[in-house]
């Protein structure tokens, strides 16, 4: 029989009685009740002097008590020292369940086999049919969800049953809750405390996506006592390390910063890890985190670990990562392979064929006509985003910018500002193309073409999200780029041509060229944007469609506000980060210069 421990409430009652307060308010308290102190029964009607002597005697005997009894007392007070910012105190009703656990950081937990997560019969459609804990259901109801999406219906029950899952679903399908709900249920069932360390680890490819998952976890865990946190590149590493040392039960992280903490933060307790989630695995590997992921998987404990790996596409690298991270015989779930289209149903997709010198004019006209809409515009490089943001804001067309060269605090503030806005324009690189759940986006504009059809799908996935979501997308194509439509058709992406009458386009070309010619800072920014555009174009993976040598540089320059192409120093062959796909296939030697030099001479002649 567990030994009762005084709660704060009972101690407070005794203090009131000691100072003459009435003994109780309920009718049941009219007669004296026994109170329990350190295993001894006393009457509440004792005098203060008798109480004091008994407490003193109890303290002396406490020193001689067995270790097991001491552990119970320690566990009831240990959580009080944790930071309120990141570590929340456990509910009083959970205190008795800490008996027999190790004292100090990293206390061992019972095996997953010792607890039973909720099981379901048949094919549940609503969250209420999952038999989830009351606290989790409160969080789901607070978020306003009732009916599950297809990926949630097919993944949550097997994950609750302890299966490893390799999942594939369209962006915007609701997979974040698919992995968070089973993870939170596991933490709750095992009664994780801060001192137990990290039990669930979610790895995300970008900082913005990590912040978004963190926001969902915060809402879902609002009624749970377990702690949650986030570690991402660009944030304060020392503050992160302090929180990890105090104990973060559910941790969201980007790969680089996670590996840093695993290797260099001594107080980071991860020996009790029960669930590993790798979200957007294909994107993690695409942006160069393959080595980091292999090291992370190797460092983390594999015994009793459930792994969930989600990827929009199943590449060879994703399969390799699945092989080393998942247990044998994982459940493969693909909710898209039977669908007619690769994009969501409520998305109206179109393209416009536009000469390079008219591209900015068309974009400017479109944004001016849609000031009351919420729009995301995608560019190919950070410097292109910077230039167009500076230009549009200068000419009183306010926009927000998001790209990889910004400091983390700026990126975070911009992301949440646009999320909370009812209207406005965000111009960005592909840093915002994967996984981000930005509410009520009306239009996706692909000003610069995507690197391939997969990037196209993820870009347009920022709109028409969720059940019955609606949205529109528009892609700008030059006449030489129409071959990309064939690739979209092969990828089951339905697009139609949009027509913009010439008389609807505001011709501000002369004013633009005058502004760029006279404003030193805009001129410098325009040159950097122009150079970055050419470099990004030359690094395109679909060279047969996007051939940098077919570009009309005079028209490209006009699109950036120059009457004639500026003289810039550019070496295309030495900086093509995306050429790695081609290099690995032996199509081109890394660092070779023939194409770059040829282009440079052509440019100087202009």
Swiss-Prot record:
Any single Gene Ontology cellular-component annotation: nucleolus
Biased composition (Basic and acidic residues): 58-74
GO biological process terms on file: maturation of LSU-rRNA from tricistronic rRNA transcript (SSU-rRNA, 5.8S rRNA, LSU-rRNA); maturation of SSU-rRNA from tricistronic rRNA transcript (SSU-rRNA, 5.8S rRNA, LSU-rRNA); snoRNA release from pre-rRNA
Enzyme category, top tier: hydrolase
Domain of life: Eukaryota
Parts forming coiled coils: none
InterPro entries named in the record: DDX18/Has1_DEADc (IPR044773), DEAD/DEAH_box_helicase_dom (IPR011545), Helicase_ATP-bd (IPR014001), Helicase_C-like (IPR001650), P-loop_NTPase (IPR027417), RNA-helicase_DEAD-box_CS (IPR000629), RNA_helicase_DEAD_Q_motif (IPR014014), SPB4-like_CTE (IPR025313)
Ranges of biased composition (kind: Polar residues): 583-592
Molecular function (Gene Ontology), one example: identical protein binding
PROSITE patterns: DEAD_ATP_HELICASE, HELICASE_ATP_BIND_1, HELICASE_CTER, Q_MOTIF
Q motif, short sequence motif: residues: 125-153
Alphabetical keyword list: ATP-binding, Helicase, Hydrolase, Nucleotide-binding, Nucleus, Ribosome biogenesis, RNA-binding, rRNA processing
Entry keyword annotation includes Transferase: no
A Pfam match: Helicase_C
Catalytic activity: ATP + H2O = ADP + phosphate + H(+)
Basic residues bias spans: 11-21, 597-606
Cited CDD domains: DEADc_DDX18, SF2_C_DEAD
Annotated residues for binding of ATP: 169-176
Motif (DEAD box): 279-282
Homology family: Belongs to the DEAD box helicase family. DDX18/HAS1 subfamily.
Function: ATP-dependent RNA helicase involved in 40S ribosomal subunit biogenesis. Required for the processing and cleavage of 35S pre-rRNA at sites A0, A1, and A2, leading to mature 18S rRNA.
Complexes and interactors: Associates in the nucleolus with the 60S and pre-60S ribosomal subunits.
Name of this chain's protein: ATP-dependent RNA helicase has1
Annotated organism of origin: Aspergillus niger (strain ATCC MYA-4892 / CBS 513.88 / FGSC A1513)
The encoding gene: has1
């Amino acid at each position: 029989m567990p030994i009762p421990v005084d709660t704060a409430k009972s101690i407070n009652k005794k203090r009131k009685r000691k100072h003459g307060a009435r003994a109780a308010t309920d009718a049941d308290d009219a007669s004296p009740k026994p109170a329990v102190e350190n295993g001894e029964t006393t009457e509440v009607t004792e005098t203060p002097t008798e109480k004091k002597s008994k407490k003193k005697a109890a303290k002396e005997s406490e020193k001689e008590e067995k270790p097991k009894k001491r552990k119970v007392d320690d566990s009831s007070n240990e959580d009080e020292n944790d930071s309120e910012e990141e570590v929340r105190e456990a509910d009083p009703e959970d205190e008795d369940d800490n008996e027999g656990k190790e004292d100090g950081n990293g206390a061992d937990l019972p095996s997953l086999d010792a607890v039973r997560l909720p099981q379901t019969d048949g094919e549940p459609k609503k969250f209420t049919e999952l038999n989830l804990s009351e606290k989790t259901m409160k969080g789901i109801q607070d978020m306003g969800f009732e009916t599950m999406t297809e990926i949630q219906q097919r993944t949550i029950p097997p994950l609750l049953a302890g299966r490893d899952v390799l999942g594939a679903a369209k962006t915007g399908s609701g997979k974040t809750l698919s992995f968070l709900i089973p993870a939170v249920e596991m933490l709750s069932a095992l009664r994780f405390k801060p001192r137990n360390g990290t039990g669930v680890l979610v790895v995300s490819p970008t900082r913005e996506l990590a912040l978004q998952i963190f926001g969902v976890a915060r809402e879902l865990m609002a009624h749970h006592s377990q702690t949650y946190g986030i570690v991402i590149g660009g944030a304060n590493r020392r503050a992160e390390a302090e929180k990890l040392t105090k104990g973060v039960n559910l941790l969201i992280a980007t790969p680089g910063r996670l590996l840093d903490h695993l290797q260099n933060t001594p107080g980071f307790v991860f020996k009790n890890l029960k669930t590993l989630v790798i979200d957007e695995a294909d994107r993690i590997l695409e942006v160069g985190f393959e080595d980091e992921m292999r090291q992370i998987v190797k460092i983390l404990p594999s015994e009793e670990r459930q792994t969930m790996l989600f990827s929009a596409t199943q590449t060879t690298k994703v399969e390799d990562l699945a092989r080393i991270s998942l247990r044998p015989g994982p459940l493969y779930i693909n909710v898209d392979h039977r669908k007619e289209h690769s994009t969501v149903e409520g998305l109206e997709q179109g393209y416009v064929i536009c000469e390079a010198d008219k591209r900015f004019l068309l974009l400017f006209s479109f944004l001016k006509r849609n000031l009351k809409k919420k729009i995301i515009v995608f560019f190919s490089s950070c410097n292109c985003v910077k230039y167009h943001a500076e230009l549009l804001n200068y000419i009183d067309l306010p926009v927000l910018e998001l790209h990889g060269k910004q400091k983390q605090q700026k990126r975070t503030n911009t992301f949440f500002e646009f999320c909370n806005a009812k209207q406005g324009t965000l111009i960005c690189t592909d840093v915002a193309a994967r996984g981000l759940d930005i509410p009520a986006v009306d239009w996706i504009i692909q000003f610069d073409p995507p690197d391939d059809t997969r990037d196209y799908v993820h870009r347009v996935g920022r709109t028409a999200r969720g059940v019955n979501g609606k949205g529109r997308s528009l892609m700008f194509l030059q006449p030489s780029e129409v071959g990309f439509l064939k690739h979209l058709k092969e990828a089951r992406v339905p697009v139609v041509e949009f027509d913009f009458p010439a008389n609807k386009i505001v011709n501000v070309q002369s004013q633009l060229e005058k502004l760029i010619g006279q404003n030193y800072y805009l001129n410098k920014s325009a040159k950097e944007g122009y150079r970055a555009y050419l470099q990004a174009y030359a690094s395109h993976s679909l060279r047969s469609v996007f051939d940098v040598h077919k570009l009309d540089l005079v028209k490209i320059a006009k699109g950036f506000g120059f009457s004639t192409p500026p003289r810039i120093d550019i070496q295309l062959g030495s900086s093509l980060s995306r050429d790695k796909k081609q290099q690995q296939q032996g199509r081109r030697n890394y660092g070779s210069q023939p194409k770059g030099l040829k282009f440079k001479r052509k440019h100087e002649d202009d």
